[in-house]
Design a protein with these regions (language model features):
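Conserved alpha-helical segments that form or flank metal/cofactor-binding pockets of metalloenzymes
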Residues: 30-81, 142-165, 244-246
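Acidic/His metal-coordination segments adjacent to aromatic residues that form catalytic metal sites
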Residues: 82-103, 164-200, 218-220, 268-289
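Long, hydrophobic, well-ordered secondary-structure blocks that form the structural core
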Residues: 102-178
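Inter-helical turn/loop segments and adjacent helix faces that build the functional surface
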Residues: 120-132, 154-159, 187-189, 211-231, ...
Length: 517
């Protein structure tokens, strides 16, 4: 009997998950728990039972590595094939590359901020399961940045504007919009970070970024971007599920958490909606072949899906964000307003802009029947006519930035698309400017945080955006040229009008060589 082998019982998913998460924790003995976890109480959130945190996927680290390894093998096979077969010549039009440049300059670095945020949040949560979830999401986001870098690096061999990403991220005026979003989240408490990224961005808004943009990449022949997008999308689906579980966990722990969470939902929904105005511009103006308009994407992914979400959360006492109605009204306007801003400041951006064709204007008229022909088409046609006469419009002045979202004041008043929205607050004898009531309210709640905002335009005026050795008092000093050199732009190659650009000429020549003798 002693020699009989006992069949080893195979653990179920639930038992295995418990061993690989809660089983990894321990109670500190030589330090009080409050000293080990000093940041999980000061935000006012009350947690009574960390064991209520459950990952709906019950994913353990060993299973995680197996899934991600399989996805990486497939992804890198496609990237290699794309590079070896000159896949960059299969895209519809070199104008499409400007959308990828903006994604690379402004979205990919944000992934690195989220890596840092989840690593920090995981360190400061007491529950073992929440720490494991944060660790996996931090690794996910790091992997997303790396796969984006490896996919997009192929374009950097042939086209302008893909270089110096890390340098530009810390300096270029329009990149301060995603950068300030990431730094605001990164410097918040661990629970606010969770609501900012896991819930407000990942659950409520992420589909507005990834689904239409990756569909647009497929429609425009960019299989490299499609593949890293789809590889990340399965992670995003998991992040979304964790996001809804995270907010429910906080709301179920204590009724006192509800007003705190509601304020964070108000803030981060609005900050995310403002940030995604860049995506709206990409969808409506920068994709030569368009899948859907920004307005249609907003109606599907924000109004329908988000509306159902907030109806579900009503039983916890959570209402739709304060800026919901204004953001829904803005779906008619923001993509046009942001495109016109970048068109006129195209000399100061590291990607190209252009005048839409007649077909593209007609498409916009169809998609925005209530607003485009009335408010935006006349202005675009006016600028196009000036360009045809050799008078391409470039703004050489600097715009006023919103202190909170850092977007130039280009958005209009709710209910009046003919009037620029402008708000002011005086705090400690200094005046601060905002693009909306909601950005002003965010500032009012955390003024000491936002008075420290590094606003690029203000820094330029203060003389802090010139390379060492530049003499602003020299007779031939050109301040705009000096600032663009500080940004490390290759002037005349990275920026300006698309028609006649080096990217346009090279793409046409290389594709001609690839398709005929």
């Amino acid at each position: 009997m002693m020699d009989m082998k006992v069949a080893k019982k195979k653990l179920g998913i639930k038992e295995r998950y418990a061993h690989m998460t809660r089983g990894l924790g321990w109670e500190p003995t030589y330090q009080p728990a409050d000293a080990v976890f000093p940041y999980d109480k000061y935000e006012g959130i009350k947690i009574h039972d960390w064991d209520k945190w459950v990952d709906p996927f019950r994913l353990t680290m060993d299973a995680y590595w197996k899934y991600q390894g399989e996805k990486d093998r497939k992804l890198y096979a496609v990237i290699e094939a794309f590079a070896q077969n000159n896949g960059h010549l299969n895209i519809t039009d070199a104008r499409y590359l400007s959308a990828i440049k903006l994604f690379w300059q402004g979205v990919s670095p944000l992934e690195n901020y989220v890596v840092q945020g989840f690593a920090r949040a995981g360190r400061h949560f007491r529950g073992e399961a929440s720490r494991v979830a944060c660790q996996m999401q931090a690794v996910d986001e790091l992997r997303h940045y790396q796969t984006q870098a490896h996919s997009i690096s192929n374009y950097n061999k042939y086209y302008n504007g893909f270089h110096s990403q890390r340098h530009m991220w810390d300096r270029v005026w329009y990149l301060s919009v995603p950068k300030s979003f990431g730094e605001d989240a990164l410097t918040s408490g661990p629970f606010e970070f969770l609501i900012a990224i896991s819930f407000s961005f990942e659950y409520v808004l992420t589909n507005l970024l990834f689904v239409p943009f990756m569909s647009g990449a497929a429609y425009n022949g960019d299989m490299s971007t499609v593949t890293f997008g789809f590889s990340a999308q399965s992670d995003e689906s998991r992040h979304m599920t964790l996001g809804i579980e995270a907010i429910k966990f906080l709301l179920e722990q204590d009724p006192a958490n509800v007003p705190i969470v509601q304020r964070w939902v108000d803030k981060w929904f609005w900050r995310g909606a403002r940030l995604l105005s860049l995506v709206g511009m990409m969808m409506d103006y920068m994709l030569p072949k368009r899948v859907m308009s920004w307005k249609e994407a907003w109606e599907i992914y924000a109004e329908e899906n988000g509306g159902a979400l907030f109806r579900d959360l009503a039983r916890y006492g959570i209402r739709p964000p304060k800026g919901w109605a204004d953001a829904c009204e803005a779906k008619e306007h923001i993509s046009h307003q942001v495109w016109l801003l970048f068109y006129e400041y195209g000399g100061a951006a590291a990607f190209h802009t252009w005048s839409p064709t007649d077909d593209e204007l007609d498409w916009l008229s169809t998609k925005y029947p209530n607003t485009f022909d009335k408010y935006y088409r006349p202005r675009i046609e006016f600028l196009r006519e000036k360009h045809a006469r050799g008078e391409r419009v470039y703004q050489t002045t600097l715009p006023t930035l919103c202190t909170t979202c850092q977007i130039p004041l280009a958005f209009t008043e709710p209910g009046d698309p003919t009037k620029i929205s402008h708000r002011e607050t005086v705090y400690k004898d200094e005046k601060y400017v905002f693009c909306s009531d909601h950005c002003q309210e965010i500032f009012a709640h955390e003024p000491e945080k936002f008075v420290q905002s590094w606003l690029p335009v203000n820094q330029i005026y203060q003389g802090n955006c010139f390379n060492p050795g530049v003499d602003p008092t020299a007779p031939d000093f050109d301040p705009l040229k000096a600032v663009l050199e500080y940004f490390r732009f290759n002037l005349g190659r990275d920026n300006g009008e698309f028609d006649g650009s080096e990217d346009q000429r090279n793409f046409a020549a290389w594709r001609g060589q690839a398709s005929k003798n």
